[in-house]
A protein has these predicted regions:
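Bacterial Sec-dependent N-terminal signal peptides
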Residues: 1-27, 275
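Subset of outer-membrane beta-barrel
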Residues: 24-405
Length: 405
């Protein structure tokens, strides 16, 4: 598919800000920080390369995008790499395909994702994980302000990641992930028709994660409580033109409780909380930093990380509004058939994404397949509205079982 865009819009895209405009932000007075009704202006948090936050896992995608503390599989590196050290299998891999903007009739934008891990160590479990994320924005025809054709391009972004995780005790594991990020949105194009060219963005980042796992005896068997936490995408800012934008630094905390119902049936309840660790735009902050940018945008990544818990112009109440909630449930029959459902909530002032998710999982011999479907519940349109996505998984235990048979 060929998309013709006004060059000004492409320039805006090259800034790669993950911004959603809410009704309260319209008509905001920068001198008072109030909207026409006297309410504090909602500040949608802005980051570059938002593709890093796209959930690539169809299993998690069917459970409202929870993933920090659910039982580990090959896609754990996206949520919480420390879970690899607690995986029951020594080896696993996955392939995921996520179509993008299908509800708008776009058919050449997609996210492809591959991940895998290998567990080693007899007395102390350790694991190495790897992943590759590729986001294609399709084919674009560049035009200038006068709609004159300048050529064609294929914007794309990718991320490679390597993780190491280690079990510190029977109940606790930690992990770290190193990443390289590349973003080519409009490389070589000039936003003003002059000599200034848009460059490709490059960045390095790290994740740190931990998982606590505790068995709890019940009448029907032993249940498993998992609690996890992860700080993700801590790295340098990414630059396309003169200014630099923050990576989507994020703090996530999650819990999941897997409960056996009988010999063949089990159910898991999970909850995740996520908050971006970057500055909240403040229309009342007119200070200019050393690089000529607004002071809130001119902070270092580390300063932004620690300051993000108290920089919202609306105070503590607005900080709480920046927390996204995900809740999900997963039912398994005989560890071969799964039914999943979930809900995702984001405050209206911070984007307004709200949706239900449903999905199925099937496992047979060496292969498992997960499907998920997203049903929006708010007026805020999303790129995954009414979209079916799927993941394929392979694990070492399945290979061993097949050989034994």
């Amino acid at each position: 598919m060929k998309k013709t865009l006004i060059f000004l819009l492409v320039t805006g895209l090259s800034l790669a800000t993950n911004t959603f405009v809410s009704a309260q932000q319209k008509g905001c007075d920068p001198t008072t920080g109030k909207d026409p009704l006297g309410r504090d202006c909602g500040g949608a948090v802005q980051t570059a390369v938002p593709f890093l936050m796209i959930n690539p896992d169809a299993r998690s995608g069917a459970m409202g995008d929870v993933g920090i503390a659910i039982s580990p599989d090959a896609n754990a590196i996206h949520f919480n790499a420390s879970k690899y050290a607690m995986a029951p299998q020594k080896f696993g891999m996955s392939l995921t395909y996520t179509p993008w903007l299908r509800s708008l009739g776009v058919n050449d934008i997609y996210l492809a994702y591959a991940a895998g891990y290998y567990q080693f160590g007899s007395t102390v479990k350790q694991a190495i994980g790897v992943s590759l994320r590729y986001f294609s924005l399709g084919s674009i025809q560049w035009t200038d302000y006068n709609a004159s054709v300048l050529g064609e391009g294929s914007p794309r972004e990718f991320e490679t990641a390597v993780s190491y995780s280690r079990q510190l005790s029977k109940f606790l594991a930690v992990g770290a992930t190193a990443k390289f990020i590349y973003s080519n949105l409009a490389t070589g194009q000039s936003p003003d028709g002059g000599s200034t060219k848009i460059s490709s963005g490059r960045a390095g980042a790290v994740d740190f994660s931990m998982t606590y796992k505790r068995p709890i005896k019940m009448a029907a068997g032993t249940s498993t409580l998992m609690i996890g936490g992860a700080v993700k995408n801590i790295g340098n800012k990414i630059t396309y033109l003169r200014s630099a934008d923050f990576l989507p630094q994020n703090l996530g905390i999650g819990a999941a409780w897997e409960i056996p119902l009988d010999q063949y049936n089990s159910i898991t309840f999970a909850l995740d909380l996520n908050k971006l660790l970057v500055p909240t735009p403040n229309p009342r902050d007119t200070a200019i930093g050393a690089n000529g940018l607004p002071a809130w945008k001119d902070k270092s990544p580390v300063s932004a990380l620690f300051g993000s818990f108290g920089d919202a112009p609306g105070g503590g109440q607005e900080e709480l509004k920046e927390i996204n909630f995900s809740a999900g449930v997963e039912y398994w029959y005989d560890k071969q058939f799964a039914v999943r459902a979930g809900y995702f909530y984001e405050n209206a002032e911070k984007g307004g994404r709200r949706y239900f998710t449903v999905g199925l999982g099937l496992k047979y011999n060496v292969m498992g397949i997960n499907l998920s479907y997203l049903v929006p519940t708010s007026s805020q349109r999303g790129p995954l509205d009414n979209t079916l996505r799927f993941s394929l998984l392979f694990d070492a235990a399945s290979f061993k079982d097949t050989e034994d048979n």
